[in-house]
């Protein structure tokens, strides 16, 4: 995702910060789960038994990976603060594109005051793995003049299948529109991995209001 965004942003008049938190990438969790299923099936030489064992082990593994990712969010916000400070030296207007669990990092940074209202021109949240309630920090940013875009897809099966069981009551916002006045909702027709294929569109949303 970062590579695709860097390609479309290279040499532009805008400074783009892309935020993805790799310690808990949902697609990587899914890949590990697939490997675990294959290993357990081979170990037990039985598809039904292997699937049961893989489900038990995979559930614990995914839960641990998620907890680790969430625990690392403050560290991600600190890194983002440094990147924002460095971006000021470029003299270019800055925007942030947050992807998947990276949305939690940006929302945490806003709540902590790391991203002040008006300090960035636009915030684009794509394939958000954060619940809608986390976005309650946005009104202050909107009032400060920062534009906010929420990009979602009803076809994002990764968000639907891998969101932690303990958070089923608060579904990830990346599957539906965000109901916050002033937030621009954009629906796309891609899965979680497919967001890299629309990097140019995400870039347009980050720098050209009304033209995405």
Show which residues each predicted segment covers:
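Lipolytic serine-hydrolase domain surface
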Residues: 1-78, 85-87, 92, 112-122, ...
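Aromatic pocket-lining residues of Rossmann-like dinucleotide-binding sites
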Residues: 109
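Gly/Ala-rich beta-loop-alpha elbow adjacent to hydrolase catalytic centers
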Residues: 96-102, 106
